[in-house]
Amino acid sequence: HCSYFTMAKCEQWKSHCSYCSQLRRYPACFAMSSVSKNFERKRRAFTGVKNMTLITPSKWLADLTRQSFLKEYPVEVHYNTIDTSIFKPTPSDFRERYGLQDKIIVLGVANVWEDRKGLFDFYKLAEMLDDRYVIVLVGLSEKQIKELPKNIKGIQRTNSPQELAAIYTAADIFVNPTYEDNYPTVNLEAQACGTKVITYDTGGCKETIYSLRSTIVAVGCIQNVAEFVLKQGKK
């Protein structure tokens, strides 16, 4: 029933789901006995369609689809796109408003911040950076903002794409330490605004990197992220 199974290292979806270690994760299932029934119901529903072409937003997901009970169906990859009339270099007074004029801004953006999005990796990164740097995280809850260490600046979610583009532009580096993802468009948005990106090599993340100034590192290698970030301060 899982949306993601990377962190759980589960491959039951290839054959038959039964015991689920992520029973309460979205979308929550409240009875272990329902896991097997749900899997079989979905198998019957999808494989009962005679003429179907599957569309995935990444090659990574397309490859997984070919390992599932959907493997008999053709799969096409159609990447999600962003609006480059909005996500482009956008000058603003963001640095002045937050008193960050002389700081090297390391940015992170998520709709919901949790362990799989790498929130606590930013905590580790903050300990590795000197006073020239400030980490700015967009999308945090009020509670999360109150719990931040002093060298991380928290901002609640913005519903304005234009404001988000201005924040991307103000940043020096965009860091996406995601542990589970499909095709994160935040990487596309940051690069479109002229900001270099470093992201973990999970899911379809590598497919989002197109700028020669951006890079990927192995999942969980926050030390490599820190080295990349610190190099920017030497320029």
Please report, for each region that a protein language model flagged, where it lies by residue.
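Short alpha-helical donor nucleotide-sugar binding micro-motif in glycosyltransferases
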Residues: 166-171
